[in-house]
Regions:
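Beta-rich carbohydrate-recognition and catalytic domains
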Residues: 1-30, 36-138, 147-181
Protein backbone atom coordinates (compact mmCIF):
# COMPACT_ATOMS: atom_id res chain seq x y z
CA UNK A 1 0.00 0.00 0.00
CA UNK A 2 1.12 3.51 -0.75
CA UNK A 3 -0.36 6.86 0.34
CA UNK A 4 0.54 10.52 -0.02
CA UNK A 5 -1.84 11.63 2.75
CA UNK A 6 -2.44 8.50 4.94
CA UNK A 7 -6.14 8.72 4.01
CA UNK A 8 -6.21 7.58 0.38
CA UNK A 9 -4.28 4.44 -0.46
CA UNK A 10 -3.02 2.83 -3.68
CA UNK A 11 -2.79 -0.95 -3.78
CA UNK A 12 -0.28 -3.04 -5.76
CA UNK A 13 -0.23 -6.84 -5.99
CA UNK A 14 2.45 -9.33 -6.96
CA UNK A 15 1.04 -12.81 -7.61
CA UNK A 16 4.08 -15.06 -7.18
CA UNK A 17 2.88 -18.24 -9.01
CA UNK A 18 1.84 -16.29 -12.12
CA UNK A 19 4.67 -13.75 -12.06
CA UNK A 20 7.50 -16.21 -11.39
CA UNK A 21 6.39 -19.20 -13.49
CA UNK A 22 9.55 -21.29 -13.15
CA UNK A 23 11.22 -21.62 -9.75
CA UNK A 24 8.35 -20.06 -7.79
CA UNK A 25 5.35 -21.63 -9.57
CA UNK A 26 4.63 -23.85 -6.53
CA UNK A 27 4.42 -21.01 -4.00
CA UNK A 28 1.60 -21.70 -1.54
CA UNK A 29 2.10 -18.73 0.76
CA UNK A 30 3.92 -15.43 1.04
CA UNK A 31 3.21 -13.63 4.29
CA UNK A 32 4.32 -11.21 6.99
CA UNK A 33 6.00 -8.70 4.63
CA UNK A 34 8.15 -6.03 6.26
CA UNK A 35 10.45 -3.33 4.92
CA UNK A 36 13.77 -1.82 5.91
CA UNK A 37 15.96 0.68 4.12
CA UNK A 38 19.17 -0.96 2.90
CA UNK A 39 21.82 1.77 3.09
CA UNK A 40 24.31 -0.31 1.13
CA UNK A 41 21.89 -0.90 -1.79
CA UNK A 42 20.30 2.55 -1.49
CA UNK A 43 16.74 1.18 -1.62
CA UNK A 44 14.00 -0.41 0.42
CA UNK A 45 14.23 -4.13 1.03
CA UNK A 46 10.95 -6.02 1.33
CA UNK A 47 11.35 -9.29 3.23
CA UNK A 48 8.74 -11.96 3.86
CA UNK A 49 8.17 -15.62 4.71
CA UNK A 50 7.67 -17.87 1.70
CA UNK A 51 6.87 -21.56 1.27
CA UNK A 52 6.36 -23.75 -1.76
CA UNK A 53 4.59 -27.09 -2.11
CA UNK A 54 7.85 -28.73 -3.21
CA UNK A 55 8.86 -31.86 -1.21
CA UNK A 56 10.84 -30.97 1.92
CA UNK A 57 9.96 -27.30 1.65
CA UNK A 58 9.43 -25.16 4.75
CA UNK A 59 8.91 -21.46 5.40
CA UNK A 60 12.04 -19.38 4.87
CA UNK A 61 12.61 -15.64 4.85
CA UNK A 62 13.26 -14.18 1.40
CA UNK A 63 13.76 -10.64 0.16
CA UNK A 64 13.48 -8.41 -2.88
CA UNK A 65 13.93 -4.69 -3.34
CA UNK A 66 10.99 -2.39 -3.97
CA UNK A 67 11.05 -0.36 -7.16
CA UNK A 68 11.52 3.40 -6.94
CA UNK A 69 7.82 4.29 -6.62
CA UNK A 70 7.12 1.33 -4.29
CA UNK A 71 4.55 -0.29 -6.60
CA UNK A 72 6.45 -3.45 -7.55
CA UNK A 73 9.28 -5.76 -6.55
CA UNK A 74 12.55 -6.01 -8.48
CA UNK A 75 13.99 -9.31 -9.63
CA UNK A 76 13.22 -12.73 -8.18
CA UNK A 77 12.97 -13.70 -4.50
CA UNK A 78 16.37 -14.18 -2.85
CA UNK A 79 16.96 -16.25 0.26
CA UNK A 80 17.70 -14.13 3.34
CA UNK A 81 17.49 -16.49 6.32
CA UNK A 82 16.08 -19.65 7.83
CA UNK A 83 16.78 -21.48 11.07
CA UNK A 84 16.81 -24.93 9.44
CA UNK A 85 13.06 -25.33 9.86
CA UNK A 86 9.93 -23.20 9.47
CA UNK A 87 11.01 -19.59 10.03
CA UNK A 88 8.32 -16.88 9.88
CA UNK A 89 7.30 -13.39 11.00
CA UNK A 90 10.69 -11.68 10.63
CA UNK A 91 11.36 -8.12 11.74
CA UNK A 92 14.72 -6.38 11.32
CA UNK A 93 16.16 -3.34 13.11
CA UNK A 94 19.59 -1.73 13.02
CA UNK A 95 21.30 -1.15 16.37
CA UNK A 96 23.78 1.73 16.18
CA UNK A 97 25.42 0.68 19.46
CA UNK A 98 26.71 -2.67 18.19
CA UNK A 99 26.49 -1.70 14.49
CA UNK A 100 24.56 -4.86 13.67
CA UNK A 101 21.25 -5.66 12.06
CA UNK A 102 19.06 -7.71 14.38
CA UNK A 103 16.53 -10.12 12.83
CA UNK A 104 13.77 -11.28 15.17
CA UNK A 105 11.73 -14.26 13.96
CA UNK A 106 9.45 -17.09 14.99
CA UNK A 107 10.98 -20.53 14.73
CA UNK A 108 8.24 -23.14 14.60
CA UNK A 109 10.23 -26.09 15.97
CA UNK A 110 11.95 -24.03 18.67
CA UNK A 111 8.62 -22.64 19.86
CA UNK A 112 9.22 -18.98 20.30
CA UNK A 113 10.86 -15.77 19.15
CA UNK A 114 14.56 -15.94 18.35
CA UNK A 115 17.20 -13.58 17.02
CA UNK A 116 20.00 -13.51 14.45
CA UNK A 117 22.50 -10.74 13.64
CA UNK A 118 24.47 -9.59 10.60
CA UNK A 119 26.79 -6.70 9.71
CA UNK A 120 24.92 -6.07 6.44
CA UNK A 121 21.37 -7.02 5.50
CA UNK A 122 22.38 -9.52 2.81
CA UNK A 123 25.28 -11.08 4.76
CA UNK A 124 25.06 -14.52 6.36
CA UNK A 125 23.01 -14.17 9.57
CA UNK A 126 24.39 -15.58 12.84
CA UNK A 127 21.78 -17.08 15.16
CA UNK A 128 21.94 -16.05 18.82
CA UNK A 129 21.16 -18.42 21.68
CA UNK A 130 17.99 -18.20 23.74
CA UNK A 131 14.43 -17.06 23.37
CA UNK A 132 13.41 -13.41 23.32
CA UNK A 133 9.87 -13.78 24.71
CA UNK A 134 9.30 -13.58 28.45
CA UNK A 135 6.39 -16.02 28.63
CA UNK A 136 5.65 -19.73 28.36
CA UNK A 137 2.68 -19.00 26.06
CA UNK A 138 2.79 -19.72 22.33
CA UNK A 139 3.86 -16.55 20.50
CA UNK A 140 4.25 -15.16 16.98
CA UNK A 141 4.18 -11.89 15.05
CA UNK A 142 7.16 -10.15 16.64
CA UNK A 143 7.61 -6.41 16.13
CA UNK A 144 10.57 -4.34 17.33
CA UNK A 145 10.93 -0.56 17.49
CA UNK A 146 12.96 2.10 19.24
CA UNK A 147 11.29 3.36 22.42
CA UNK A 148 10.30 7.01 22.71
CA UNK A 149 13.29 7.62 25.02
CA UNK A 150 15.59 6.86 22.06
CA UNK A 151 17.80 4.67 24.26
CA UNK A 152 15.87 1.43 24.58
CA UNK A 153 13.86 -0.92 22.40
CA UNK A 154 10.31 -2.23 22.64
CA UNK A 155 9.72 -5.83 21.57
CA UNK A 156 6.12 -6.94 21.15
CA UNK A 157 4.67 -10.28 20.13
CA UNK A 158 1.27 -11.89 19.86
CA UNK A 159 0.35 -14.40 22.57
CA UNK A 160 -2.19 -15.77 20.10
CA UNK A 161 -3.68 -18.46 22.32
CA UNK A 162 -4.63 -15.85 24.94
CA UNK A 163 -5.74 -13.07 22.62
CA UNK A 164 -3.26 -10.40 23.69
CA UNK A 165 0.12 -8.89 22.89
CA UNK A 166 2.97 -8.87 25.36
CA UNK A 167 5.56 -6.09 25.50
CA UNK A 168 9.18 -6.30 26.63
CA UNK A 169 11.92 -3.70 26.86
CA UNK A 170 15.64 -3.97 26.12
CA UNK A 171 18.54 -1.56 26.25
CA UNK A 172 20.96 -3.82 24.36
CA UNK A 173 18.81 -6.24 22.29
CA UNK A 174 20.41 -9.05 24.32
CA UNK A 175 18.40 -8.99 27.54
CA UNK A 176 14.63 -8.54 27.62
CA UNK A 177 12.45 -7.38 30.50
CA UNK A 178 8.69 -7.91 30.68
CA UNK A 179 6.74 -4.63 30.57
CA UNK A 180 3.06 -5.55 30.24
CA UNK A 181 0.41 -7.66 28.50
Amino acid sequence: LKSKDLINWEHSTVNFPTRYTKEWKNVIRVWAPETIYDKKAGKYMVFYSLRTSDPGSFDKIYYQYANEDFTDLEGEPKWLFDAGNATIDGDIVYNENDQLYHLFYKQESGRGIFQAVAKNLTDRWRMLDGNVEQTKEAVEGVGVCKAIDGKSWIIMYDCYGSGHYQFCKSTDLKTFEFVQN
